[in-house]
Amino acid sequence: MIPVRCFTCGKVISTAYEEFKRRRDASEDPKRILDDLGMDRYCCRRMLLTHKEIIDELNPYQ
């Protein structure tokens, strides 16, 4: 489950997650990706950098 807003400042970050994930999987530098996406605040950067997808692990327990 992708976080919709930054927990600290409330900025919408879900719009940047898919592109961040795609570019990170292509081995691009996370700093450059976040700079290009306009994620200037360190709290928002933290939200994207530390997010871990666990939805596939939770599906069997529905």
Curated annotation (Swiss-Prot):
PROSITE patterns: RNA_POL_N_8KD (PS01112). SUPFAM superfamilies: RNA polymerase subunit RPB10. Part of the RNA polymerase complex. GO terms for molecular function: DNA binding; DNA-directed RNA polymerase activity; zinc ion binding. It catalyses: RNA(n) + a ribonucleoside 5'-triphosphate = RNA(n+1) + diphosphate. Binds 1 zinc ion. DNA-dependent RNA polymerase (RNAP) catalyzes the transcription of DNA into RNA using the four ribonucleoside triphosphates as substrates. Zn(2+) binds at residues 6, 9, 43-44. Its main location: cytoplasm. GO terms for cellular component: cytoplasm; DNA-directed RNA polymerase complex. Its EC number is 2.7.7.6. This is DNA-directed RNA polymerase subunit Rpo10. It comes from Methanospirillum hungatei JF-1 (strain ATCC 27890 / DSM 864 / NBRC 100397 / JF-1). It comes from the Archaea. Pfam families: RNA_pol_N (PF01194). The gene is rpo10. The keyword Zinc applies. Its cofactor is Zn(2+). GO terms for biological process: DNA-templated transcription. The keyword Kinase does not apply. It is found in: Cytoplasm. Keywords: Cytoplasm, DNA-directed RNA polymerase, Metal-binding, Nucleotidyltransferase, Transcription, Transferase, Zinc. Belongs to the archaeal Rpo10/eukaryotic RPB10 RNA polymerase subunit family.
